């Protein structure tokens, strides 16, 4: 597949601290957050002018799904734009609460677990051809995805019966199946529910739900770029060593608990390999593939970073990657603080730091403190992020959806949209079906807009 459509869906954690008598439940806090959305969209499930979807998911979790992107850097920009949109809702909600006499702070966390042990996800979407054998895709991808956490995990302080330990992945403890059609009940690595949001005869949507939510833009870019490379190798028929895991679910937890990347996990053929060895195998195949096929600068930069992360894990020298990779950045931050204050990993202050790293408020969040102090690298520069809050990607179907929404709102027309339909709710109930996610220009949509 020459071009590929990508998308990221992120569920956010919500909590609120109060200083007065009145208390609000998480459901009520979520309703305050979405009050402005509901006032213009008449729903807590809306599509925005930038082509994205914003909605309140199960369990009062705000969720933002980026518009369809065919460019990796643009995907990162749109993921960050979603963060900024939610930050704006947070500021509005706090002002509204203050006007009503409720004193408190609302927090939105771009992480994957709350203090009660609940998990919420960051789902990656990759458009793949229908003609390929999906089961083979999953077979090759699962060992890659299980071990990928040592490269792009978000890091977590995990309380265990033997004390607190620092883990590489937040999501690893909450994955229960390899491949499944459910997302909440069983939490698989790859979700197989067949919803391509495109021409079902031509495409499938690979829905990866094993990944962590990343604060660092470079980690997000790396996560999607290396997965895209592995997909392209599979699609091109590149021979990849059989590293099928005997028990992917046990392996994902064992790998997460070992920052050295050296702990061996058992393969289905009885052999054993470490996460470092598994990732190195994929990386060396990818390096040959990129050299042979010729890729653009983004894939080449991410291939270099992938190798550098593996070197950092191998040598234990996290200074090689602590500006770019979330789990390393957070670990170094926590370790410096612990050394200064002589604190154990189990200290409540460390748990608080772990959470504060993921606070999306730019005035309060620990990650944004590092960003202000130029201690982390960026790939999505702020003017582009600001523009992406309102402007859809211009080379995919998202452009049609965004333009339709913008014009309908300006003309005060009642409309309904989803990923594939654009509908004017007038007497004629005119609807355009947009099955091709690569198509950014469509005469039928132009006519529908002109008729408003």
From Swiss-Prot:
User: What does the record give under GO molecular function?
Assistant: ATP binding; ligase activity, forming carbon-nitrogen bonds; magnesium ion binding; ubiquitin-like protein transferase activity
Amino-acid positions noted as binding Mg(2+) in the UniProt annotation, renumbered to this chain:
9, 55, 63
What catalytic activity does the UniProt entry give for this protein? ATP + [prokaryotic ubiquitin-like protein]-L-glutamate + [protein]-L-lysine = ADP + phosphate + N(6)-([prokaryotic ubiquitin-like protein]-gamma-L-glutamyl)-[protein]-L-lysine
* Top-level enzyme category: ligase
Does Metal-binding count among this protein's keywords? yes
Listed pathway(s): Protein degradation; proteasomal Pup-dependent pathway; Protein modification; protein pupylation
Please give the family membership noted in the entry: Belongs to the Pup ligase/Pup deamidase family. Pup-conjugating enzyme subfamily.
Any miscellaneous information on file? The reaction mechanism probably proceeds via the activation of Pup by phosphorylation of its C-terminal glutamate, which is then subject to nucleophilic attack by the substrate lysine, resulting in an isopeptide bond and the release of phosphate as a good leaving group.
Q: What is this protein called?
A: Pup--protein ligase
**Species this protein is from:** Geodermatophilus obscurus (strain ATCC 25078 / DSM 43160 / JCM 3152 / CCUG 61914 / KCC A-0152 / KCTC 9177 / NBRC 13315 / NRRL B-3577 / G-20)
């Amino acid at each position: 597949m020459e071009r590929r459509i990508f998308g990221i869906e992120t569920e956010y954690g919500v909590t609120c601290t109060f200083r007065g008598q009145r208390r609000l439940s998480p459901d009520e806090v979520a309703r305050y957050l979405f009050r402005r959305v509901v006032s213009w969209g008449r729903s807590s499930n809306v599509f925005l002018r930038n082509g994205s979807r914003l909605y309140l998911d199960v369990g009062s979790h705000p969720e933002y799904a980026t518009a369809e992107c065919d460019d990796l850097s643009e995907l990162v920009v749109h993921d960050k734009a979603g963060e900024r949109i939610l930050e704006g809702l947070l500021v509005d909600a706090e002002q509204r609460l203050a006007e009503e006499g409720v004193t408190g702070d609302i927090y939105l966390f771009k992480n994957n677990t709350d203090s009660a042990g609940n998990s919420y996800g960051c789902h990656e979407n990759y458009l793949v051809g229908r003609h390929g054998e999906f089961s083979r895709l999953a077979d090759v991808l699962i060992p890659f995805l299980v071990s990928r956490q040592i490269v792009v995990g978000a890091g977590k302080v995990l309380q265990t019966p033997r004390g607190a330990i620092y883990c590489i992945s937040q999501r690893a403890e909450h994955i229960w199946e390899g491949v499944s059609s459910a997302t909440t009940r069983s939490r698989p690595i790859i979700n197989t529910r067949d919803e391509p949001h495109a021409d079902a005869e031509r495409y499938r949507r690979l829905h990866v739900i094993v990944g962590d939510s990343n604060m660092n833009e470079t980690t997000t870019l790396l996560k999607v770029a290396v997965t895209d490379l592995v997909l392209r190798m599979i699609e091109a028929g590149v021979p990849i060593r059989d590293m099928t895991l005997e028990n992917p679910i046990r392996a994902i937890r064992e790998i997460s608990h070992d920052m050295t990347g050296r702990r061996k996990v058992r393969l289905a053929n009885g052999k054993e390999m470490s996460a470092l060895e598994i990732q190195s195998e994929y990386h060396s195949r990818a390096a040959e593939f990129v050299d042979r096929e010729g890729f653009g600068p983004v894939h080449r930069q991410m291939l270099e970073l992938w190798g550098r992360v593996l070197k950092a894990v191998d040598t234990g020298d996290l200074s090689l990657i602590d500006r770019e990779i979330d789990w390393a950045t957070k670990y170094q931050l926590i370790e410096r603080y612990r050394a200064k204050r002589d604190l154990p990993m189990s200290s409540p202050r460390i748990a608080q730091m772990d959470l504060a790293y993921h606070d999306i408020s730019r005035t309060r969040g620990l990650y944004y403190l590092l960003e202000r102090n130029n201690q982390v690298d960026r790939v999505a520069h702020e003017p582009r992020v600001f523009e992406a809050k309102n402007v859809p990607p211009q080379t995919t179907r998202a452009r049609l959806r965004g333009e339709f929404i913008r014009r309908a709102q300006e003309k005060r027309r009642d409309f309904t949209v989803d990923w594939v339909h654009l509908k004017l709710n007038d007497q004629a109930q005119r609807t355009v079906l947009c099955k091709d996610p690569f198509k950014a220009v469509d005469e039928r949509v132009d006519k529908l807009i002109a008729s408003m």
